[in-house]
Amino acid sequence: MECFKTTLAGVVLVVLLLQQAPVLRANDPDPLQDFCVADLDSEVTLNGYPCKPTPAAGDEFLFSSRLATGGDVNANPNGSNVTQLDVAGWPGVNTLGVSMNRIDFAPGGTNPPHVHPRATEVGIVLRGELLVGIIGSLDTGNRYYSRVVRGGETFVIPRGLMHFQFNVGKTEATMVVSFNSQNPGIVFVPLTLFGSNPPIPTPVLVKALRVDAGVVELLKSKFTGGY
């Protein structure tokens, strides 16, 4: 009987720990000081960047004009340009668990289907009309959610869900998005499947996508060298 009680107590403890694990790993670690300006040149990194001495960093780490202007929307076949403002471009957000992007779109331009593995995304359309699409997980039957979002309107993308934006208007469009991670990461679905290095074996994609090898090779040729 005593052995049973000990085993039961152990099982309860494990269950409680498992319940806490998702909470403990839900976002970036909390900061332990007011500022931790990232030392991007340090050779020592451990799930982030070490801190520069605050006096040596000046006060520019609190401010950035990086998103004031966008990039060339015709610089790639997607017809969009992403201006990133993560810890690499704004060392002041180190340990703060936030980052931002600005995305500009040509008419008909798209931010291709992609995933942010480490962050929830919330965005606001500044100008234009963007079709925002979100695809749920298998738990939802891969349900597709979408809406045309216009200037001043907002949207949210749960962490890890595939999504895209597409400019359905006749003029350029711009949106700004924020993440609850200093480095949200991005996995572009088409590039991941057909432009990986080294390539995913063609027979794997033939079986997974239910197409012939010629189609797979054609798609791979479109993503050689990235976007």
From Swiss-Prot:
Any one of the GO CC terms: apoplast
Family from the record: Belongs to the germin family.
Intracellular or extracellular location(s): Secreted, Extracellular space, Apoplast
Gene Ontology MF annotations: manganese ion binding
A Pfam family matched in the record: Cupin_1
Function of the protein: May play a role in plant defense. Probably has no oxalate oxidase activity even if the active site is conserved.
Positions of disulphide bridges: C36-C51
Coiled-coil portions: none
Leader sequence segment: 1-26
Protein name: Germin-like protein 3-3
Keywords of the record: Apoplast, Disulfide bond, Glycoprotein, Manganese, Metal-binding, Secreted, Signal
Carbohydrate-modified residues: N78, N81
Organism listed in the record: Oryza sativa subsp. japonica (Rice)
Binding positions (Mn(2+)): H114, H116, E121, H163
Residues annotated as domain Cupin type-1: 65-217
Taxonomic superkingdom: Eukaryota
UniProt KW Metal-binding keyword: yes
Subunit field text: Oligomer (believed to be a pentamer but probably hexamer).
Alphabetical list of PROSITE patterns matching this protein: GERMIN
